[in-house]
Amino acid sequence: MYDAVVFDNDGVLVGRTSFDTLREAAWDAFVSLGVDDPDLIHVDDVAVGVNPATLTDICERYEMDPAEFWRVRDETASAAQIAAARKGQKTPYDDIDTLRHLDASLGIVSSNQQATVDAILDHFGLAGQFEVAYGREPSIASLSRKKPSPYYLERVLEDLDAETAIFVGDNESDVRAADNAGIDSAFIRRPHRRHIELSCQPTYEIADLHDLVSICGRAPVDPDESI
């Protein structure tokens, strides 16, 4: 039914990173640039979901260069998440093997760092399942390209030469990114999204990755093949 199936990564293919891990990484970024006691509100602001304007304002308060701070922040956040994966604190979901049953090209679009996406896919032996995987580059400009912007999603679709596609995500921003790219969406109700009410309408709502087989079609599979 679709030329391509594109996935968000965190909360869809692998578990999410705990906020405490991201907060600690953000704190370490401040400290590494000479700010030993940053306001915890500012630490939380840059830990998750910061926009360029807020980032610039915070950096001005501490007389830091925004571009340098954001590079360090992304590096520390990436290192913390990779460490969590290696410690078994961030692992693939149990239904990950479903990927090999999907009759379409597979891709990833994540708002996480490119380095984090690449390292986690490699660590769990998943990289070969995807023809392309995009995360953010460590720049302030990347913050404006995150979902719901279709920027990275459109790059994946172009790379896969896909005329029809579906984007699978666990956030409203994923559904809106799919809408903005002109493709279908599937909102996956992992346990952390089981009871959330959406203010936008995905094409499908699914309980787990197994539901995608009936939506996307089943590919021929070698019984000896595994992820």
Model-derived segments and spans:
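N-terminal helical cap/lid subdomain that shapes the substrate entry/recognition surface
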Residues: 2-100
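Conserved phosphate-coupling serine/threonine residues in phosphotransfer and NTP-handling enzymes
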Residues: 110-112
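Asp-based, Mg2+/Mn2+-dependent phosphohydrolase catalytic module
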Residues: 2, 114, 120-227
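Internal, well-ordered alpha-helical segments in soluble enzyme and binding-protein domains
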Residues: 55, 95, 116-117, 152
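Generic recognition of short, well-ordered alpha-helical segments
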Residues: 17-21, 119, 180
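Surface-exposed amphipathic alpha-helices with a cationic face
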Residues: 96-103, 175-179
